[in-house]
Protein backbone atom coordinates (compact mmCIF):
# COMPACT_ATOMS: atom_id res chain seq x y z
CA UNK A 1 0.00 0.00 0.00
CA UNK A 2 1.34 3.48 -0.77
CA UNK A 3 2.62 5.38 2.20
CA UNK A 4 0.16 7.83 3.78
CA UNK A 5 -2.54 6.86 1.29
CA UNK A 6 -5.98 5.83 2.47
CA UNK A 7 -7.41 2.69 0.90
CA UNK A 8 -11.12 2.27 0.14
CA UNK A 9 -12.43 -1.30 0.42
CA UNK A 10 -15.68 -3.19 0.70
CA UNK A 11 -15.88 -5.40 3.78
CA UNK A 12 -18.36 -8.27 3.71
CA UNK A 13 -19.51 -10.24 6.75
CA UNK A 14 -21.02 -13.73 6.72
CA UNK A 15 -22.98 -15.97 9.14
CA UNK A 16 -22.61 -15.12 12.84
CA UNK A 17 -19.97 -12.47 12.07
CA UNK A 18 -22.65 -10.59 10.08
CA UNK A 19 -25.19 -11.08 12.86
CA UNK A 20 -22.85 -9.61 15.48
CA UNK A 21 -21.67 -6.69 13.32
CA UNK A 22 -25.23 -5.94 12.22
CA UNK A 23 -24.69 -5.50 8.49
CA UNK A 24 -23.92 -7.59 5.42
CA UNK A 25 -21.28 -5.27 3.97
CA UNK A 26 -19.85 -1.79 4.20
CA UNK A 27 -17.50 0.40 2.21
CA UNK A 28 -14.79 1.92 4.37
CA UNK A 29 -11.74 4.12 3.97
CA UNK A 30 -8.88 2.36 5.73
CA UNK A 31 -6.19 4.45 7.41
CA UNK A 32 -2.77 4.15 5.77
CA UNK A 33 -1.36 2.25 8.76
CA UNK A 34 -3.71 -0.72 8.19
CA UNK A 35 -1.43 -3.06 6.26
CA UNK A 36 -2.50 -6.64 7.12
CA UNK A 37 -5.67 -8.57 7.84
CA UNK A 38 -4.70 -8.60 11.54
CA UNK A 39 -4.28 -4.79 11.48
CA UNK A 40 -7.75 -4.51 9.95
CA UNK A 41 -9.31 -6.73 12.61
CA UNK A 42 -7.70 -4.61 15.35
CA UNK A 43 -9.00 -1.43 13.72
CA UNK A 44 -12.51 -2.87 13.31
CA UNK A 45 -12.62 -3.91 16.98
CA UNK A 46 -12.15 -0.24 17.92
CA UNK A 47 -15.13 0.88 15.82
CA UNK A 48 -17.73 -0.17 18.38
CA UNK A 49 -18.98 -2.88 20.70
CA UNK A 50 -20.60 -4.89 17.90
CA UNK A 51 -17.25 -5.20 16.11
CA UNK A 52 -15.42 -5.94 19.35
CA UNK A 53 -17.87 -8.78 20.01
CA UNK A 54 -17.68 -10.15 16.45
CA UNK A 55 -13.87 -10.26 16.56
CA UNK A 56 -13.48 -11.14 20.25
CA UNK A 57 -11.80 -14.41 19.20
CA UNK A 58 -9.99 -13.38 16.01
CA UNK A 59 -8.22 -16.73 15.74
CA UNK A 60 -11.50 -18.40 14.73
CA UNK A 61 -12.66 -15.78 12.22
CA UNK A 62 -11.51 -16.53 8.67
CA UNK A 63 -10.73 -13.93 6.01
CA UNK A 64 -10.63 -13.74 2.24
CA UNK A 65 -9.07 -11.00 0.12
CA UNK A 66 -10.72 -10.67 -3.27
CA UNK A 67 -12.23 -14.16 -2.76
CA UNK A 68 -8.94 -15.87 -1.85
CA UNK A 69 -8.63 -17.34 1.67
CA UNK A 70 -5.70 -15.78 3.54
CA UNK A 71 -3.93 -15.75 6.91
CA UNK A 72 -4.09 -12.84 9.39
CA UNK A 73 -0.52 -11.87 8.50
CA UNK A 74 -1.39 -11.38 4.81
CA UNK A 75 -0.83 -7.87 3.47
CA UNK A 76 -3.92 -6.09 2.15
CA UNK A 77 -2.07 -4.54 -0.78
CA UNK A 78 -4.50 -3.33 -3.45
CA UNK A 79 -7.36 -5.51 -2.17
CA UNK A 80 -10.81 -4.24 -3.11
CA UNK A 81 -12.98 -6.69 -1.14
CA UNK A 82 -12.39 -8.32 2.23
CA UNK A 83 -14.70 -11.00 3.61
CA UNK A 84 -14.91 -12.28 7.17
CA UNK A 85 -16.64 -15.55 8.04
CA UNK A 86 -16.58 -18.38 10.60
CA UNK A 87 -14.63 -21.57 9.95
CA UNK A 88 -16.15 -23.65 7.18
CA UNK A 89 -17.04 -27.24 7.95
CA UNK A 90 -18.60 -29.89 5.85
CA UNK A 91 -18.31 -33.32 4.50
Task: Label each residue range with its predicted role.
Residues 1-90:
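Ubiquitin-like/PB1-type beta-grasp interaction modules and other compact soluble beta-rich domains
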Amino acid sequence: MAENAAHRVRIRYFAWVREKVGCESEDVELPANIETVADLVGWLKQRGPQYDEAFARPQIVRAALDKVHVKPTTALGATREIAFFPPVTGG
